[in-house]
Amino acid sequence: MSNQHTLLMTNLLPVGSNISTWWNFGSMLLTCLALQTMTGFFLAIHYTANINLAFASVIHITRDIPYGWTMQSLHAIGASLFFICIYIHIARGLYYGLYMNKEVWLSGITLLFTLMATAFFGYVLPWGQMSFWAATVITNLLTAIPYLGTMLTTWLWGGFSINDPTLTRFFALHFILPFIIISLSSAHIMLLHTEGSNNPLGTNSDIDKIPFHPYHSNKDMLTATIMITMLFITLSFLPNLLNDPENFSKANPMITPQHIKPEWYFLFAYGILRSIPNKLGGTLALLTSVMILATTPFTHTSHIRSMTFRPMTQTLFWILIATLITITWTATKPVEPPFMFISQMASMIYFSFFFMNPLLGWTENKIMMNN
């Protein structure tokens, strides 16, 4: 009988002994979720979902409510921290072949879509200039859907333009979606622990498992403490580091900002959207940029699960990371040469990763068989 069965018999969660710090981001995401839910609740108490009062209510929270500025900044910086953690979490999954646990991976992608929707709705709520125009640009993408587009856009707006009903429903959605995220996270964790977590070697670790507590729980607490410390340092010294200067002005439908862009964590998708000079094509590319992650469990061809011992695939992975950084950078620039060309090239390289990965896996298999 393996030590996994012994641990299960004594009611202890068995976990591989060699999982690295990259496995800590799940618990850090849970910490972020708890923090965002709590700060969001206190902000919702004082927020007013009305186009004439929303901007003033955010100013009222930061100026007049005791520790309101702390809650507002924690919630704003916490959202960025959430996305930093989730992107590292996904990158770890791609690198170590965790997508082979299909149920966990696909539930994670559903979680990512829900999180992105929540963040988008939340960005609109302060009703600043960039909030309003980002909402206008993104919701307008629905009009690209043939036949139904205009009807769907009008239905989402609650009228013929972005107005009070739009803000009210966005606030309602922003309030309810975190609870859906909590439910999906529970399902994600339960699905993970039916089979157990993978490890950096990509091997079966049933013969060498240790109890989660106190070993990994202490490890999780350390990284969560480091994360919260970084959050409070940013809050104290650079609270507006990730805010758009345009959002300090109240929304004005009569004045268009010189350069409309979403929050930094959506810039990679926005860059891919802009790189295609066609509304429907750009919208499909935007959706595909995230949905393509769901193909990885079905296109894995290598006999080895993890990239730890696959140098060629490692090179491809780091090219993907560099490409995403490049797309993010070009999305902050105006729609003009050479930025558009760089963005288009980077978008092509991004999508080619998901076609090259199975081909490279097959090539590696051939090399190993010949040796």
From Swiss-Prot:
Transmembrane residues, as ranges?
25-45, 69-90, 105-125, 170-190, 218-238, 280-300, 312-332, 339-358
What are the binding positions for heme b b566 in this chain?
H89, H188
* Binding-site positions, heme b b562: H75, H174
- Any signal peptide, and if so, which residues? none
Q: Which family does it belong to?
A: Belongs to the cytochrome b family.
Miscellaneous note, as given in the UniProt record, is: Heme 1 (or BL or b562) is low-potential and absorbs at about 562 nm, and heme 2 (or BH or b566) is high-potential and absorbs at about 566 nm.
**GO CC list:** mitochondrial inner membrane; respiratory chain complex III
Q: Which cofactor does it need?
A: heme b
**InterPro entries, per database record:** Cyt_b/b6_C, Cyt_b/b6_C_sf, Cyt_b/b6_N, Cytb/b6-like_sf, Cytochrome_b, Cytochrome_b_C_euk/bac, Cytochrome_b_N_euk/bac, Di-haem_cyt_TM
Please give a single GO biological process term from the UniProt record. Answer: mitochondrial electron transport, ubiquinol to cytochrome c
* Principal place of residence: mitochondrion
Cofactor annotation remark = Binds 2 heme b groups non-covalently.
Per the record, the domain of life is Eukaryota
GO MF: metal ion binding; ubiquinol-cytochrome-c reductase activity
What membrane topology does this protein have? Multi-pass membrane protein
| Positions of a ubiquinone binding | H193
Assembly and oligomerization: The cytochrome bc1 complex contains 3 respiratory subunits (MT-CYB, CYC1 and UQCRFS1), 2 core proteins (UQCRC1 and UQCRC2) and probably 6 low-molecular weight proteins.
Cross-referenced SUPFAM superfamilies, in alphabetical order? a domain/subunit of cytochrome bc1 complex (Ubiquinol-cytochrome c reductase), Transmembrane di-heme cytochromes
Purpose of the protein:
Component of the ubiquinol-cytochrome c reductase complex (complex III or cytochrome b-c1 complex) that is part of the mitochondrial respiratory chain. The b-c1 complex mediates electron transfer from ubiquinol to cytochrome c. Contributes to the generation of a proton gradient across the mitochondrial membrane that is then used for ATP synthesis.
Tell me what organism the protein belongs to: Elapsoidea nigra
The record's gene field reads: MT-CYB
Q: Is the keyword Transport in the record?
A: yes
* Keyword field: Electron transport, Heme, Iron, Membrane, Metal-binding, Mitochondrion, Mitochondrion inner membrane, Respiratory chain, Transmembrane, Transmembrane helix, Transport, Ubiquinone
Protein name, per record: Cytochrome b
Location comes to: Mitochondrion inner membrane
